[in-house]
Amino acid sequence: AQASSRGLGDEYQREGGGDGVRVDPLKTVATPNKGYFGTDITVMSLNSYNSGASPVTIAKLANSVGADIVMLSETTKGTAKLVAQLMEKAGSPMQMFQSVPRTLRGSSRDYQTILLVSVYFGTYEVNESITPDTSLGAVTVVPQNRDANFAYLPTIVAGHVYQPNLLHTGQWRHELKQMVDMCHGPQAENLIMAGDMNATPWHGGLADMGACVDALAEKKSGSVGTWPTYLPRPLGVPIDHIFVSKSHWHTAGSTVADVSGTDHRAVLTRLTYSEM
């Protein structure tokens, strides 16, 4: 049975400020001074390791940095829904988007890639036709508000690329190219894309990101290991990424965070919008 929001709220309060989550101090990420229309956007991406990271822990991190966009891979619908409920309870209501079904060929479908977007951005809708062809979950959403106040809003992509191995190298290359191609198409003019790419910045597939830039690399966080967490950060590999259109989005700050229950570190960035 689904837990009541009151019970979840109590658990959220009991867990305290330091349990389960450690974020490097970074004032440019954890800022409360965002305008109503959010031209400064905070993005968080986390592989929750088959929902090993609890909704309380995930929501605590998202709320602590004021996340406007949250990408969760290897996550159940139930986990994401509880994260959204906890964020709403903290004053950050979110709209939730599940993976496009055709992108779940390699998944049990219980665990997928789910995207949360602030309701203060107005209505977003899934665009299946431009969603990358992955097998562990992907979704692309586009803004429906076209008035001047929302003109800056980006197309948002969340995806999880299949892991590279001897038997599936071709599949990995195909799926990685599908994600990278988003930065070479018309949607790249104003794009935020994040997720578990299962590739480092030094893999050939990420060598040419077209109209995009790695938001973490802009602030020298791009080489910090995000997986596996049992290795120190300098020894891990940075396979979780946030890419943005370099003509519109500039990185004000970025960091990675240790999150209990998952073998991945979360990646976070605060972005500032500018006209071309």
Give short role names for the model-derived ranges.
Residues 38-50, 125-128, 152-163:
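Active-site-proximal beta-strand elements of phosphoester/diester hydrolases
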Residues 119, 130-136, 140-145, 161-162, ...:
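Aromatic/acidic, Gly/Pro-rich catalytic loop(s) in extracytoplasmic/lumenal soluble domains
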Residues 43-51, 164-171, 227-231:
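Acidic/histidine-rich helix-loop elements
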Residues 42-48, 58-84, 116, 156-159, ...:
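Active-site beta-strand/loop signature of hydrolases that rely on acidic residues for catalysis
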Residues 94-116, 200-260:
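Active site of divalent-metal-dependent phosphoester/diester hydrolases
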Residues 14-61:
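N-terminal signal-anchor transmembrane helix
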Residues 20-30, 69-154, 158:
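Structured beta-strand-rich core segments of catalytic domains in phosphoester-bond hydrolases
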Residues 2-15:
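Single conserved hydrophobic/aromatic residue that forms the stacking wall/gate
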